[in-house]
Amino acid sequence: MKTALAFAAAITLTGCAATPAASNPQDEFFAALTAHCGKAYAGKLASNQDADADMRGKAMVMHVRSCTPDRIEIPFHIDGVGPDGGWDRSRTWIITRTATGLRLKHDHRHADGSKDELTMYGGDTANAGTASRQTFPVDAESIALFTRTGRSVSNTNIWSVETTADSFTYGLSREGRDFRVTFDYRQPVAPPPAPWGW
């Protein structure tokens, strides 16, 4: 009898041990980006709209500059479009954890480090997404900012961030608008200077 009970207990414990923990796509996504912390990569414009003509053919660099368990800062540098014709270091993508998912915000600065009128806009995830792709519909705070600054065309923005084994892609979409830049993880480059104001 004791042997039978011991065997039954062993079977029960084995069954418990074999049950895998449920995976969280957003945790996996966050970890995948964090794995690149401190590294910078070359990129390019991947979309083809007239609104982005000034960026076409320009050198681009993304830098996973700072990572904590709840926040990742990714400056986005573009050559040839700065105020002096050099590098524009005005943009930083900030991804943070929230109680309900992930949040993407855009920190925009002027060359003197002061904040742009249009800064800290973005949105929160509305679903779990996948380990390689998260989308961020515009939030109420950003809609208010866009409306106040005469940019209500952006009130339906949806941003996306993708990270795969080979690349990182940032995107913006809304009706009539498609903007994408992609960076090759196989082309690491020297980390650039700090973004303006940081």
Task: Describe these PLM feature segments.
Residues W93-L145:
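An exposed acidic His-Trp-rich patch
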Residues R133-E175:
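Helix-rich interaction surfaces within compact, conserved domain-sized segments
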Residues P25-A51:
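Tryptophan-anchored aromatic micro-motifs
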Residues R65-H106:
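Mid-chain, structured segments of secreted extracytoplasmic proteins
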Residues A59-R65, R91-T96, Y121-G123, T156-V161, ...:
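Hydrophobic/aromatic beta-strand elements that line small-molecule binding cavities or substrate pockets
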Residues T119-D124, A165-W198:
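Edge beta-strand at a domain terminus
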Residues A42-P69:
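Short, solvent-exposed loop/hinge segments that bridge or flank secondary-structure elements
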